[in-house]
From Swiss-Prot:
UniProt cofactor(s): Mg(2+)
Transmembrane stretches, start-end: none
Short sequence motif named Microbody targeting signal, residue ranges: 535-537
Name of this protein: Isocitrate lyase
Active site: C203 (proton acceptor)
EC numbers for this chain: 4.1.3.1, 4.1.3.30
Superkingdom of source: Eukaryota
Lineage: Eukaryota, Fungi, Dikarya, Basidiomycota, Agaricomycotina
GO CC annotation terms, alphabetical: glyoxysome
């Protein structure tokens, strides 16, 4: 065996040993270690995000064992990241926030993932570089402290693992892999990716969401894992499903999607698209076209195929219990499997008219009926390829979270779950508002080990900016002193002394190291106005 072959075989064996570690006990890979090694370069690169990924895994493992959650929110900038570091264990980077405030094209917009694909990775880098800087700054400051000062000054872990929004992957499988590579290089400990179609992606709390087939999303998850393996990192991947509220799907090619695709049960109707094309040719527009589509949908009596089979069996005289058994039996089967079961096991004589092509939209999408059962079905399919599962929801209903957790854990015991504590919900209107404080921890008991408010950084920024601007316009510096400076002092916010927070002492230390310990141009020397904050006012 040549030395090159021997080196290749040795690296393959090393990867195989790596995959047998507890870290990957739940992970399924449809490729071999040799596939991975053959796609690596000859220079081994160590990525800081790998350290962060391992840290995140250890953190969530402890929470899973204890039935507790790690909760966080979406950070906008280095200021928020350093404040979060004092109290929270992780940092979230939101695609929604990046779309509105940090697009790499500098063109803001809603959360449609129509910004350049490097937008969120760039925001991750922005925040991760700040984390690294403040970690260095703290270490230098502590090196100058006495033993007593060290004992009385808590260490802040600025290197909180970052989990970032990968949207739908921004394209095909190689686009997903390139996006994953960017996230690893920029410092993300983990990413999440959703099962929507790229060109029609919407915020999870918008209408008009279009799903991709189950296998297509599994391929994305596998692509992410393969990219991680090629880079030799243990970063995490969160599989999100938007199927709870989805109404469309791109294709019926995957048998596992069949039970949730709707079809017309009215054989007298022509296909919807034909009707709409004819109406447009007649000069119909806007509300007129919408009324025509609404009328067609109503007349079509859209049903899921198991429902259509159940009605047909009932019409043939089957008992209610027999019909219920049929529905239970075919509820997760493909169209052809469901027909075979209905005929052979339940004696169905006539397969009912049910046409899933007739209601297709002008874009060619199939009508889809989402819901919690659908989300459980998809999540269970994604579980072998992901570290955490996340069901996007319309409302934060604890009973629904329990149903989802139970449905997943019945198939995948101990599977880690994630939960979006979304600001898109009007929390004050919810029935469990009296248990608001307990909500996060109740979810933790169900296995939702990682939870996050996607846009809390945006909303907290908006709140204080609006409040301060209103009052500053009326009362001038009185507003700044009362709303900002005094409050910073009261809560111990270190940005009160913003020169020190920004690293001026650290920069002086660098300069003095170069010049032998003396500098007449030190930023924090005599004359710096920040010394006023050490005086009694």
């Amino acid at each position: 065996m040549s030395s090159e072959r021997a080196q290749f075989a040795s690296e393959v064996a090393e990867v195989e040993r790596w995959w047998k570690s507890p870290r990957f006990a739940r992970v399924n890979r449809p490729y071999t270690a040799a596939d991975v090694v053959s796609k690596r370069g000859t220079i081994k690169i160590n990525y800081p995000s790998d350290v962060q990924g391992k840290k995140l895994w250890k953190l969530l493992s402890e929470h899973a064992k204890n039935g507790t959650p790690s909760h966080t929110y979406g950070a906008l900038d280095p200021v928020q990241v350093t404040k979060m570091a004092k109290y929270l264990e992780t940092v979230y980077v939101s695609g929604w926030q990046s779309s509105s405030t940090a697009s790499s094209s500098n063109e803001p917009g809603p959360d449609l993932a129509d910004y350049p694909s490097n937008t969120v990775p760039n925001k991750v880098e922005h925040l991760f570089m700040a984390q690294l800087f403040h970690d260095r700054k703290q270490r230098e400051a502590r090196s100058r402290m006495s033993d007593a000062e060290l004992a009385n000054t808590p260490v802040i872990d600025y290197l909180r693992p970052i989990v970032a929004d990968a949207d739908t992957g921004h394209g095909g499988l190689t686009a997903v892999m390139k996006l994953t590579k960017m996230f690893v290089e920029k410092g993300a400990a983990g990413i999440h990716i959703e099962d929507q179609a790229p060109g029609t992606k919407k915020c999870g709390h918008m209408a008009g969401k279009v799903l991709v087939p189950i296998q297509e999303h599994i391929n994305r998850l596998v692509a992410i894992r393969l990219q991680y393996d090629i880079m030799g990192v243990e970063n995490l991947v969160v599989a999100r499903t938007d199927s709870e509220a989805a109404t469309l799907i791109t294709s019926n090619i995957d048998d596992r999607d069949h039970p949730f695709i709707q079809g017309s049960t009215n054989p007298s109707l022509p296909p919807l698209n034909n009707v709409m094309v004819e109406a447009e040719a007649q000069g119909k527009t806007g509300d007129q076209l919408q009324a025509i589509e609404d009328g067609w949908i109503k007349a079509a009596n859209l049903q899921l195929f198991p429902q259509a089979l159940a009605q047909a069996l009932a019409n043939e005289g089957a008992s209610r219990s027999t019909v219920e058994k049929l529905v239970a039996r075919v509820s997760r089967l493909s169209w052809s499997q469901a027909v075979a079961v209905a005929q052979k096991e339940f004696g169905l004589k006539q397969v009912p008219y049910w046409n899933w092509d007739a209601p297709r939209t002008r874009e060619g999408y199939y009508r889809y009926q989402g819901g919690t059962e659908c989300a459980i079905h998809r999540a269970n399919a994604f579980a072998p390829y992901a570290d955490l599962l996340w069901m996007e929801t319309k409302k934060p209903i604890l009973a629904q979270a329990k149903e989802f957790a139970a449905g997943v854990h019945a198939v995948h015991p101990g599977q880690w779950l994630a939960y979006n504590l979304s600001p898109s919900f009007n929390w004050k209107l919810l029935p469990q508002r009296q248990d608001m404080q307990a909500y996060v921890w109740e979810l933790g008991k169900l296995g939702f080990v990682w939870q996050f408010i996607t846009l809390a950084g945006l909303h907290s920024n908006a709140y204080i900016s609006d409040l301060f601007a209103q009052n500053f316009a009326k009362t001038g510096m009185k507003a700044y002193v009362e709303l900002v400076q005094s409050r910073e002092r009261e809560i111990g916010c270190d940005v009160l002394t913003h020169q020190k927070w920004s690293g001026a002492d650290y920069a002086d230390s660098l300069i003095k190291t170069v010049t032998g310990g003396v500098s007449s141009t030190a930023a924090m020397g005599a004359g710096v106005t920040e010394s006023q904050f050490t005086s009694k006012l």
